[in-house]
Amino acid sequence: MVKIMSINLTAKDKMKKLAEIPVLYSDASLKKCLDLMTEKSLGITCFTDRAGKLVGLLTDGDLRRLLLNKQSPLPALLVSDGLSFGNSNPKVGHADDQISDLQNLMNEKQIWDLPIVDSSGVLLGLLHRHDANQ
């Protein structure tokens, strides 16, 4: 059996929807961030403002660096403390971007998870490298 792949797949065809990814406001606790990463089985959390606009992201590696540098108890740390170790201006894709273009961007920039936003910067979902390649 031959599998026919569409060459017109876009981010919206492959991205994880908001309900499937860790999303918090930037005033959340780091513990909540870690709990949500664990619950959603992803090594990234996206942060939005109250209007849903993407304001940054933290990876599990960013959190590790934060904990090692701050030497503060976990309950005392907020996500806003961690954004200096994370990315407050992440690369993003858009729902109608071609998967092949986003794969090239992810490969070039060595990105595993790419936030997908609308034209106003509102977070719509997340494209995981494995999902893009399937």
Where on the chain are the PLM-derived regions?
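Tandem CBS (Bateman) regulatory domains
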Residues: 2-20, 55-111, 123-134
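A structural micro-motif recognizing beta-strand termini
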Residues: 25-28, 95-97
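Short, basic/aromatic recognition patches
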Residues: 28-35, 100-104
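Acidic (E/D-rich), amphipathic helical modules within compact regulatory domains
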Residues: 32-69
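Short loop/turn microsegments at loop-to-beta-strand junctions
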Residues: 42-43, 111-113
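Proline-centered helix-kink/hinge sites
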Residues: 46, 90, 115-116
